[in-house]
Amino acid sequence: MNTAGDLFWNNVTEILKDNNKSLKSVALYMRDGVNDKKTLALYDKLYRYKREAINPPNVLIDGVLNYLKKFDKNLMISDLYSDWSEYDAEN
């Protein structure tokens, strides 16, 4: 069964792969391009959420989605994710 976390991370991974980017690129974007220990910690946190296929906190989701908007102005992933979020809220 696909969970909201699976759906979110599968779509994030696909968009990053299509654009030759990685989670480290996302972490650098979220930290304004500063490559320091905090950026590495953020990358580790994102990677752990991805590996465990769980949803990160909303502030991290917003950062990831803002980064992905660079590649897809319509950002279909946010539509899919919001559908799952509504489903989770109802159940």
Region spans (language model):
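Short, charged recognition helix plus adjacent turn
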Residues: 1-4, 20, 73-91
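A short, Lys/Arg-rich alpha-helix, primarily the initiator
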Residues: 1-33
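N-terminal positioning helix adjacent to the helix-turn-helix/winged-helix DNA-binding module
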Residues: 4, 8, 22, 42-45, ...
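Residues within the helices of the helix-turn-helix
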Residues: 13, 24-28, 44, 62, ...
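A short, basic/aromatic helix-end/turn motif that makes direct DNA contacts
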Residues: 29-32, 49, 67-70
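Recognition helix of helix-turn-helix/homeodomain-like DNA-binding domains
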Residues: 32-56
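DNA major-groove recognition helix of helix-turn-helix/homeodomain DNA-binding modules
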Residues: 57-78
